[in-house]
């Protein structure tokens, strides 16, 4: 029997329903059936409604796209244990304490979570590119539990001030491909925007290596702001940025410390999902 697929409007309407809505059950039942029949290797996370809804919402309840995303998620985790097998925060605590990463206190006007990464606080002699990417994966696994984030996705700001050749050497073609996989179709979060600021000339070689692995949709959502970025950034993120980037209410140090505390409080959960797929 031909399977009915919701059109864009229906999918977006389903996206706004609460987890307990009976209207979500047909999609949940079908996605669960596909996973069980395919015998896909399981992650440590059981096939609860909440877990399956991440994939359905990430693809606006298009079952075929959600199923493809889920298969890619399992495949990526199995093939990249150096990234996904150990999500315990103590492995990257030095990066967090250095102030490499923070999450803004408020969402943007579209409801997206906004994440900030500062390359100057990554010492490539101490932490590898895999360590750095694990920071992003840890945050992603935490915020993907939020229903509003499932609906409205994330936007990332990368401050590339301090980017050096030693950083570039860490981003091999293999690493670039793995990073691109998560940005495109291997993790159940909608990437709504990527904003690069203070990008030096030597960064463009690395960007050129990653770009071929990205979808056209993701490419269209990448914004290069350069060194004179404050006015353009404030247009994208009015009233929610830290002082270092044109805001007024709080500093990067504040939000880095707050997010580090939140990650450490989530250590038990992160440990529980850190086992490698069997």
UniProtKB/Swiss-Prot annotation:
Residues involved in (+)-alpha-tocopherol binding: 187
Residue positions binding a 1,2-diacyl-sn-glycero-3-phospho-(1D-myo-inositol-3,4-bisphosphate): 185, 190-192, 217, 221
CDD domains found in the cross-reference section: SEC14
Phenotype upon changing residue 221 to W: Loss of tocopherol secretion (in vivo). No effect on tocopherol binding and intermembrane transfer (in vitro)
Record-annotated CRAL-TRIO domain positions: 88-253
Organism: Mus musculus (Mouse)
Alphabetized UniProt keyword annotations: Cytoplasm, Lipid-binding, Transport
Binding sites annotated in the UniProt record for a 1,2-diacyl-sn-glycero-3-phospho-(1D-myo-inositol-4,5-bisphosphate): 208-211
Molecular-function annotations in GO: lipid transfer activity; phosphatidylinositol-3,4-bisphosphate binding; phosphatidylinositol-4,5-bisphosphate binding; vitamin E binding
Role played: Binds (+)-alpha-tocopherol, enhances its transfer between separate membranes, and stimulates its release from liver cells. Binds both phosphatidylinositol 3,4-bisphosphate and phosphatidylinositol 4,5-bisphosphate; the resulting conformation change is important for the release of the bound alpha-tocopherol.
InterPro entries per UniProt: CRAL-TRIO_dom, CRAL-TRIO_dom_sf, CRAL/TRIO_N_dom, CRAL/TRIO_N_dom_sf
Cellular localisation: Cytoplasm
Gene Ontology terms: cellular component: cytoplasm
Main localisation: cytoplasm
Outcome of mutating residue 217 to A: Loss of tocopherol secretion (in vivo). No effect on tocopherol binding and intermembrane transfer (in vitro)
Entries under PROSITE patterns matching the protein: CRAL_TRIO (PS50191)
PANTHER family per record: ALPHA-TOCOPHEROL TRANSFER PROTEIN, ALPHA-TOCOPHEROL TRANSFER PROTEIN-RELATED
Lineage: Eukaryota, Metazoa, Chordata, Craniata, Vertebrata
Quaternary structure and interacting proteins, as annotated: Monomer and homotetramer. Phosphatidylinositol 4,5-bisphosphate binding induces the formation of homotetramers. Phosphatidylinositol 3,4-bisphosphate is less efficient in inducing tetramerization.
Pfam families tied to this protein: CRAL_TRIO, CRAL_TRIO_N
Descriptive protein name: Alpha-tocopherol transfer protein
Gene Ontology biological-process annotations: embryonic placenta development; intermembrane lipid transfer; negative regulation of establishment of blood-brain barrier; placenta development; positive regulation of amyloid-beta clearance; response to toxic substance; vitamin E metabolic process; vitamin transport
